[in-house]
């Protein structure tokens, strides 16, 4: 697996970084980025946040994140899994997951994120789903031309040298579980085989 150098790049996940930065800017508070990877999102969140904490369980990837944010005083990287992360008494104004939620148990992780929110805090997810219905496959096929254009236009960097996993849950299953844990959450099917989830406490 290759290792991308520290710097900006574009792929199907970073395509939605502006959406997340926009939400963070509404709060100007404390952000928890779960599965922060090489720290690019944490770096981008820093200018609009009081503090950013990134969680990354893979040691080598966490080291890259630390290198990226080393000059940012209000960004910390924790080398741990979300399951083992202990926030103490801290509560967050925004908890983000970018292509990380499908690495974990969906129900448990959403509930844990919910319980770490400050009053009026939010959860924002850029997630992946597994095609589980005919409509899922039709949607994916119809999006392919736009995806190919986007990849070429933005010079897609699909492999940045981080651990990946195939999604297990269908979007229908994700919607069902999310509705039980985060009533009123909004989930939208988007380009690049991603969905966006947003919920306010």
Model-derived segments and spans:
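C-terminal alpha-helical "lid/dimerization" subdomain adjacent to the S-adenosyl-L-methionine
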Residues: 129-177
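A short, conserved alpha-helix within the catalytic core of class I
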Residues: 104-113
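Conserved beta-strand signature within the Rossmann-like core of class I S-adenosyl-L-methionine
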Residues: 120-127
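Conserved class I S-adenosyl-L-methionine
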Residues: 29-37
């Amino acid at each position: 697996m290759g290792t991308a150098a520290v710097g900006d790049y574009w792929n199907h996940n970073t395509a939605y970084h502006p959406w997340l930065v926009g939400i963070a800017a509404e709060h100007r508070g404390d952000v928890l980025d779960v599965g922060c990877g090489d720290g690019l999102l944490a770096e981008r969140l820093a200018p609009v946040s009081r503090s950013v904490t990134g969680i990354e369980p893979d040691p080598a990837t966490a080291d890259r994140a630390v290198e990226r944010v080393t000059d940012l005083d209000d960004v910390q990287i924790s080398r741990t899994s979300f399951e083992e992360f202990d926030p103490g008494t801290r509560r967050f104004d925004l908890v983000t997951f970018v292509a990380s939620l499908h690495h974990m148990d969906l129900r448990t992780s959403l509930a844990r994120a919910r319980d770490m929110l400050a009053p009026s805090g939010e959860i924002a997810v850029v997630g992946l789903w597994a095609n589980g219905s005919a409509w899922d496959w039709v949607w994916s096929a119809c999006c392919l031309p736009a995806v190919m254009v986007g990849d070429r236009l933005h010079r897609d960097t699909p492999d940045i040298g981080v651990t990946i996993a195939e999604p297990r849950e269908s979007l229908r299953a994700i919607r069902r579980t999310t509705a039980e844990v985060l009533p009123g959450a909004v989930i939208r099917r988007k380009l690049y085989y991603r969905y966006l989830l947003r919920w306010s406490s």
